[in-house]
Amino acid sequence: MIDLTGKTSLITGASSGIGSAIARLLHKLGSKVIISGSNEEKLKSLGNALKDNYTIEVCNLANKEECSNLISKTSNLDILVCNAGITSDTLAIRMKDQDFDKVIDINLKANFILNREAIKKMIQKRYGRIINISSIVGIAGNPGQANYCASKAGLIGMTKSLSYEVATRGITVNAVAPGFIKSDMTDKLNEKQREAIVQKIPLGTYGIPEDVAYAVAFLASNNASYITGQTLHVNGGMLMV
């Protein structure tokens, strides 16, 4: 049984979907959770469901100062989960520079800042767990998502590099790469589109946000203390690496 009692976790992109599921599970396992996102109303709704042992931090990851401040004003931090991200999809020949830049800025650069500032705190206590949420497309690629795929592949490379740098300080840095997870986006697909995707998944179904949350909880726990620099794939066998 995973026990996170006494730990403090910061989860970005916590207002819905995978981020919300991660926050709920870490809270259930005993951790105090700092839930962060750009939608204050959704964060409040999540807070009402959690009832206690939580803090809300509204943060715009496009603002680098806000990224740094999000960590600096956290008095105690044991677990960082970088889940927030955006998409801006189109074929590369139609993709404007600003469409590429904004995805990289939020999905990669902002997460680098969060990792860097968290490490500064974790080094002082010689303990920390960092989990960066990547994606199946960060490994496999996907047409129309050159910017998003680059950002998610970059997260994996960054995770490996940082894990080397902090391994002797009691800090582990890992990534989780979800596949097709049931969400508002997948709900908008028609039956033919859903069936085409499911046929590519050996387990024959979409994942759910809780599937990703349990992977994160494991990596955040002492049960995973000998695991660092790794990417845990949660994709129903859609990609085997």
Curated annotation (Swiss-Prot):
Binding residues annotated for substrate, in chain numbering: S135
Key word Thylakoid present: no
Reactions catalysed, as given in the entry: a (3R)-hydroxyacyl-[ACP] + NADP(+) = a 3-oxoacyl-[ACP] + NADPH + H(+)
UniProt-annotated binding residues for NADP(+): G13, A14, S15, S16, S38, E57, V58, N83, Y148, C149, A150, S151, K152, I181
UniProt GO MF annotations: 3-oxoacyl-[acyl-carrier-protein] reductase (NADPH) activity; NAD binding; NADP binding
This protein's record includes keyword NADP: yes
PROSITE patterns: ADH_SHORT
EC number: 1.1.1.100
Pathway given in the UniProt record: Lipid metabolism; fatty acid biosynthesis
Keywords per UniProt: Fatty acid biosynthesis, Fatty acid metabolism, Lipid biosynthesis, Lipid metabolism, NADP, Oxidoreductase
SUPFAM superfamilies attached to this UniProt entry: NAD(P)-binding Rossmann-fold domains
Active site (UniProt): Y148 (proton acceptor)
BP GO terms, sorted: fatty acid elongation
Pfam families from the UniProt entry: adh_short_C2
Protein task: Catalyzes the NADPH-dependent reduction of beta-ketoacyl-ACP substrates to beta-hydroxyacyl-ACP products, the first reductive step in the elongation cycle of fatty acid biosynthesis.
Subunit structure of this chain's protein: Homotetramer.
Family: Belongs to the short-chain dehydrogenases/reductases (SDR) family.
Name the UniProt record assigns to this protein: 3-oxoacyl-[acyl-carrier-protein] reductase FabG
